[in-house]
């Protein structure tokens, strides 16, 4: 559906980058639309592209999950017009040159305090995508450049993550949040004929990157993004603010700073 929001998460597949949080939210949206087929739902196409390290079993399971979600959605044509998932194989620079200009939402959802920096969010920003993310890595600098109104921030900050770690019990969230419980149970019942018990068990029993803790906030951020997109004048202003604010991330500015501040050189 070319009229849908293109919600893009393209990066290395790792649990700290939390593609599993994105997938869990898609499952929750799928469950909602199955129960409410006539709901007023802004159509969304979730686009993933990622590679996992050869020996990283859980990352490969998450790729398998995303692909099976995409196949399950295709079984219901009416629902698939509202909710679609695409996993692009063999992600590389050439593919990113096509994908990044097409993105409406840039998913930068790592657990706060885990991302060193990264440049993918900057590339999406300069192409006009709106960042939906945590206060982690270069998202902090993007936030400083575009302001509160032109970025969608959710989840815990670093201090809140550190305060929560010692007593974190994801099973408590599973038992108290009906939407989370149904989504995780769906992993165990099966998606496109495949069960994902190991992902479900990890989320319920350890959840090392606190996907369940940030789930409610993430859902609200997604809902807010959909509401913003309905107002195309507002959305285009947000997009232009991101393009205009991206200049600080240019290589020229970075080299100038190094030459002046580190190497003591003048023009």
Regions found by a protein language model. Name each.
Residues 1-96, 111:
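Long, K/E/R/D-enriched contiguous segments that form extended
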Residues 3, 9, 49, 56, ...:
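A near-ubiquitous, low-amplitude feature marking generic local secondary-structure context
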């Amino acid at each position: 559906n070319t009229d849908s929001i293109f919600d893009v998460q393209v990066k290395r597949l790792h649990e700290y980058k939390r593609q599993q949080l994105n997938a869990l939210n898609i499952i929750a949206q799928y469950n909602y639309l199955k129960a409410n087929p006539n709901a007023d739902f802004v159509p969304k196409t979730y686009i993933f592209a990622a590679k996992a390290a050869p020996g990283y079993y859980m990352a490969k399971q998450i790729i398998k999950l995303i692909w099976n979600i995409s196949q399950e959605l295709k079984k219901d044509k009416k629902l698939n017009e509202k909710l679609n998932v695409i996993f692009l194989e063999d992600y590389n620079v050439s593919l990113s040159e096509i994908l990044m200009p097409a993105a409406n939402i840039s998913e930068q959802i790592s657990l706060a305090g885990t991302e060193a920096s990264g440049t993918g969010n900057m590339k999406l920003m300069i192409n006009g995508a709106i960042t939906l993310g945590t206060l982690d890595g270069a998202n902090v600098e993007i936030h400083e450049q575009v302001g509160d109104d032109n970025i969608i921030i959710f989840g815990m900050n670093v201090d809140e993550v550190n305060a929560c770690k010692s007593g974190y019990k994801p099973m408590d969230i599973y038992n108290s949040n009906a939407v989370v419980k149904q989504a995780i149970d769906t992993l165990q019942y099966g998606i496109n004929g495949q069960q994902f018990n190991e992902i479900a068990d990890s989320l319920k029993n350890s959840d090392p990157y606190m996907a369940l803790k940030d789930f409610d906030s993430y859902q609200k951020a997604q809902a807010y993004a959909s509401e913003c997109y309905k107002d195309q004048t507002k959305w285009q202003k947000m997009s232009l603010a991101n393009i205009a604010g991206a200049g600080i991330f240019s290589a020229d500015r970075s080299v100038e700073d190094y030459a002046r501040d580190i190497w003591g050189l003048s023009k």
